[in-house]
């Protein structure tokens, strides 16, 4: 059995989970707990990073398999959180917070999809944009 892929996922996952916790705490300190800003922030930021690194590391530089596992499956998989998003949405539903619920669902989904797209555009600009001016 090859240990390297499992170790890459474990280390990336540990760092991603710790980063998610820190971002969530910082968001709660900045904006309070009336809306799950921390979850929204990690999901949209993680989506941007996924789009960016998909182009840079996979498309352009063909990163090693173990590094892709570390970053995408490990770090970004643990940094972003669909389960927290779902649990927070269920809480809003059960409490009858309809506006917050709809806002949470729309902003997380549309925001995350948009950020993946924007991440790919930024990566393409960084990689190709400067070549066009030479």
Swiss-Prot record:
Membrane-crossing residue ranges in chain numbering: 7-27, 38-58, 69-89, 110-130
One of the record's GO cellular component terms: plasma membrane
Main location: membrane
UniProt keyword terms in alphabetical order: Cell inner membrane, Cell membrane, Ion channel, Ion transport, Membrane, Metal-binding, Sodium, Transmembrane, Transmembrane helix, Transport
Residues that hold Na(+) according to the record: 77, 80
Cysteines joined through disulfide linkages: none
Highest taxon listed in the record's lineage: Bacteria
Compartments it resides in: Cell inner membrane
Modulation of this protein's activity: Na(+) is not transported, but it plays an essential structural role and its presence is essential for fluoride channel function.
Catalyses which reaction(s): fluoride(in) = fluoride(out)
Membrane topology: Multi-pass membrane protein
Name of one Pfam family that matches: CRCB
GO terms classed as biological process: cellular detoxification of fluoride
One MF annotation (Gene Ontology) recorded for this entry: metal ion binding
InterPro entries: FluC
Role, per record: Fluoride-specific ion channel. Important for reducing fluoride concentration in the cell, thus reducing its toxicity.
Family recorded in the similarity comment: Belongs to the fluoride channel Fluc/FEX (TC 1.A.43) family.
Protein name from the UniProt record: Fluoride-specific ion channel FluC
Organism: Legionella pneumophila (strain Corby)
């Amino acid at each position: 059995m090859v240990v390297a892929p499992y170790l890459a996922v474990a280390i990336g996952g540990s760092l991603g989970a710790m980063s998610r916790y820190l971002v969530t705490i910082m968001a709660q300190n900045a904006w309070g707990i009336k809306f799950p800003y921390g979850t929204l922030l990690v999901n949209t930021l993680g989506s941007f990073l996924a789009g960016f690194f998909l182009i840079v590391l996979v498309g352009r530089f063909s990163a090693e398999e173990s590094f892709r596992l570390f970053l995408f499956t490990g770090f970004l998989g643990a940094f972003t959180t669909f389960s927290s998003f779902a649990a927070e949405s269920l809480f809003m539903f059960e409490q009858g917070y309809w506006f917050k619920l709809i806002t949470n669902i729309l902003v997380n989904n549309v925001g995350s999809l948009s950020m993946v797209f924007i991440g790919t555009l930024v990566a393409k600009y960084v990689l190709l944009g400067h070549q066009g001016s030479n």
